From Swiss-Prot:
Positions of region (Linker): 237-257
UniProt protein name: Bifunctional protein GlmU
Catalyses which reaction(s): alpha-D-glucosamine 1-phosphate + acetyl-CoA = N-acetyl-alpha-D-glucosamine 1-phosphate + CoA + H(+); N-acetyl-alpha-D-glucosamine 1-phosphate + UTP + H(+) = UDP-N-acetyl-alpha-D-glucosamine + diphosphate
SUPFAM superfamilies (UniProt xref): Nucleotide-diphospho-sugar transferases, Trimeric LpxA-like enzymes
Coiled coil stretches, renumbered: none
Amino acid sequence: MLNIKLNIVILAAGKSTRMNSDIPKVLHLLAGKPILQYVIDTAIKLKAKCKSTNIYIVYGYKGELLQQKLAHKQKTFLHWIKQVEQSGTGHAVQQVLPFLGKDEEVLILYGDVPLISFQTLIHLLTTRSKQGLSLLTANLTNPDGYGRILYKEQEVVGIIEHQEANAQQKLISEINTGILAVSSNELKIWITKLTNNNSMNEFYLTDIIALAWQEGKKIHTIHPEKISEINGINDCAQLANLERLYQKEQAESLLRIGVIIADPNRFDLRGELKHGDNIFFDTNVLIEGQVSLGNQVTIGTGCIIKNTVIGDNVIIKPYSIIEEAHLANGSIVGPFAHLRPGSKIEENAYVGNFVEIKKSTLGKKSKVAHLSYIGDANIGKDVNIGAGTITCNYDGANKHQTIIGDNVFIGSDSQLIAPLTIGDGATIGAGTTVTSNVTSNEVIISRIRQFPIINWQRPKKKIRYNIIY
């Protein structure tokens, strides 16, 4: 626990010009989550580690949309402050000054730098001296576009923005990430001394570094553990590159703890994955939302799994889509199966090729092997659903339930017209349309009687001859 009063300022007022999109840059998705949400989540983690914390988001372009998309999740944590005119980072921070108390810590973050880690920020806060500031910097092989760190006798004396730097300064490889920790008392003084006497006519927050040095304040620098932590997003190419980098990092983290991934370059995790032992992911698997896997789970190529709980010894065959479902131990799904929200597959049940299940329970050891639609149904144990069976659950206005008992056999190409109850041990003949309840152990057949025609001959096509002269 840090015994400090912390103010986290997240700058998110940019117009996102280079994204060429009507959507604010910080609302674009990285691994399925808005870019800004990553920074907010990290800020909330810090909140739990400090004596008290306020989180301020400085917004501008389409700020109402930002609040609509994000604020509902953390209403009590976030304070939204509008920057009416975008006049640089110093001007953005100035909007927060009236809300800062005396002798408090201020941490500056950026809404378009999503992967900054909790550990790095804790390090940044703990290294700041009482009479100075801490600055997050990094050494890059290609520092183009970044402000450069200026030293004099091994002490940081300032930051020069790329567009203001001379040829010699542009050779400096240590760059400013923009992320810093500073005292509220000193920040208030230094912000008022900023000028916009530069090529962009903006108030640069980075100019407070030179002001701090001139006053003899100690300026600490630390580096992030990974360069990806400080990667900013300004255009679609940078977003795509960071997506691939982040996905590979997640895959490598899973590999290190024993999860087998056939190809880390073709694995996507857009959410949170909890898992047991002996997990195998084939290529091009997508995990979304909150997914939990038991032990001995195999997921075939091309599968999409979203907000689902999967038990032990489960096999998901290729190209299956599973969302908001529950799969019990020993179940098998696919290939080409679709489990929609509310599907519950019980122990050792089987869902096969081109089967769609929605808001239904498939009991223990029951099978729906081929080409079927099961919707709003409760199916018992040891049931066999033949190929092409459909639960007709919708009457054009309302959905109705189908209840099937234990040990029921449903023949192929049957239609079950809900609302409907089929008792234990019943048998439904192939091609039957069931319109009323079936009692236990009853056999139901409703199809046209077969009539044989003796000595019938199939019509033959006439042979046409083309004469070529």
